[in-house]
Amino acid sequence: LVQKWVGLSLFGQNLPQRLLILDGKPNTGKSTLVLILQALIGEENVCQLRTECLAERFELNRFRGKTLLIGCDVPGDFLMKRGASVLKSLVGGDPLSVEAKGLNNAFQVKGDFNVVITCNSRLRVRLDGDAGAWKRRLLIVRYDAPPPQKRIQHFDGVLLKEEGSGMLNWALLGFARLKEDLRETGDF
């Protein structure tokens, strides 16, 4: 699942309209995976996701030109925040009106962003009677393995330096596998 999702992120459009949640014990590799993903995609294509700001007037403008939105080490109530329901539109292919400071006219963006969220606890979701839509969009991977005995500083950089081309090939294979899944089942 993670391989396919990383491949999807390289593609840049969220075809299956899903968001990835990596939750579980600290020091188990969740943030390392996200740092590697950012490096593969390019920092210029990534933006921090702030659910508490999603309902604000100019927040969506921050996502213009981005393909990956990340919420790293978020609190357990991250999906309970006032603007969290906008996430469904950000990944669901919906047209979104965006306002930018200093511009008189709003413009449209398509909500096909890839979204990954990491958390050391299980996230709680404000359903607002829309449990089906949330269930359809959430992909959850639990990190329950014990942390390593010895931490390697800047492990993401070490892995990218030593295994970068292999990781890119792994992600591309994941995207090929996802495309096959989408042809066969329409989903992961």
Question: What spans do the regions from the language model cover?
Answer:
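Feature primarily recognizes SF3-like P-loop helicase cores of small DNA viruses
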Residues: L1-T28, T32-F188
